[in-house]
């Protein structure tokens, strides 16, 4: 099953589902959402979505014995912990349940994402009108209060090591903070900044916090600010990493 947590922009979720179905034509797929707020919102529009627990119990009722649960989370944070708890609660009902890893789990995952985003975003500037000075990109993640927040700092570090010195990572609710990221922009003498959601879907969170608050705060500091409303789930190479995690989960016990 594929698990989504942000306000669903349907085609983003559908795109990764399509990639997964194509890669594993013999598997039965179910979709679930970890956010009860999103589930409630969708219900008011007549769209019914299960929580992971509901989806698992439904599969049990249909007689399935071997399950792999793949999340679309970016880091191994609170939502992954909650998902694993749900899985543990129904373990006795199945012969086996495996849980696939989030996007950024291994060093190799982070290196791949660094390369994908670095190349893609730098290329997006080269295609547009040639600007004076270098465009700086700020990847904005949700953030978390668990040790998983270190993943964001790792991404910031890896981007710079890979030669993408014009990339900086910040989080809305964790570390690196807005202030930490701002200090980096100042040190780099940046003038023009593009904000990019470091989230699977660029939903309400991204619109309010990134296109709203962060943009305003940076403009107050004197920066020219652009916003690129593209969630990670839109990028085919990122979708492929999630599909690879399913493949790994099918081959190895996790």
Which residues make up each language-model segment?
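Short, small-residue-biased leader/transition segments that mark boundaries at the very start
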Residues: 2-8
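Non-catalytic structural scaffold of enzyme domains
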Residues: 10-68, 76-194, 199-204, 212-254
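Phosphate-coordination/substrate-recognition cap region in phosphate-metabolizing enzymes
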Residues: 73
């Amino acid at each position: 099953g594929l698990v989504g947590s942000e306000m669903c922009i349907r085609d983003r979720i559908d795109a990764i589902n399509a990639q997964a179905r194509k890669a594993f034509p013999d598997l039965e797929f179910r979709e679930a959402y970890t956010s009860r707020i999103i589930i409630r919102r969708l219900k008011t529009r007549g769209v019914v979505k299960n929580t992971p627990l509901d989806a698992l119990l439904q599969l049990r009722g249909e007689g399935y014995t071997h399950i792999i649960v793949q999340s679309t989370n970016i880091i191994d944070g609170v939502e992954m912990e909650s998902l694993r708890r749900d899985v543990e609660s129904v373990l006795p009902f199945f012969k086996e349940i495996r849980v696939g890893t989030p996007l950024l789990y291994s060093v190799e995952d982070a290196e791949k994402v660094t390369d994908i985003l670095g190349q893609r975003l730098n290329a997006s500037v080269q295609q547009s009108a040639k600007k004076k000075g270098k465009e700086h990109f700020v990847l904005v993640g949700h953030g978390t209060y668990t040790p998983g927040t270190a993943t964001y700092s790792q991404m910031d570090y890896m981007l710079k090591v890979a030669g993408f010195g014009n990339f900086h990572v910040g989080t809305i609710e964790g570390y690196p903070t807005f202030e930490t990221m701002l200090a980096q922009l100042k040190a780099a003498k940046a003038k023009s900044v593009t904000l990019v959601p470091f989230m699977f879907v660029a939903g309400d969170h991204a619109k309010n916090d990134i296109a709203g608050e962060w943009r305003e705060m940076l403009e107050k500091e004197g920066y020219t600010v652009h916003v690129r409303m593209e969630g990670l789930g839109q990028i085919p190479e990122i979708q492929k990493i999630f599909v690879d995690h399913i493949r790994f989960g099918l081959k190895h016990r996790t």
